[in-house]
Amino acid sequence: MPQLDTSTWFTTVLASSITLFILMQLKISFHDLHKKPSNKYLKLFKPTNPWEQKWTKIYSPLSLPQP
């Protein structure tokens, strides 16, 4: 039975590990992270109804004076 030649295993494992590391780094570097939400669209919004511009107080029936 012939002896198994293991002299190239170190080179094969090392090259595979380096290749896998490079591929994973490339995959991670192309991944886009979400940006934080900004308020630029809220500043452009203007209310169109007159009741949205002023504050109104709503009374609860239980808070009204009882006769």
Swiss-Prot record:
The gene is MT-ATP8. Pfam families: ATP-synt_8 (PF00895). GO terms for molecular function: proton transmembrane transporter activity. The modification N6-acetyllysine is found at K54, K57. The lineage of its organism: Eukaryota, Metazoa, Chordata, Craniata, Vertebrata. It is found in: Mitochondrion membrane. It comes from Cricetulus griseus (Chinese hamster). InterPro entries: ATP8_mammal (IPR039017), ATP8_metazoa (IPR001421). The keyword rRNA-binding does not apply. Its main location: mitochondrion. This is ATP synthase F(0) complex subunit 8. The chain crosses the membrane at residues 8-24.
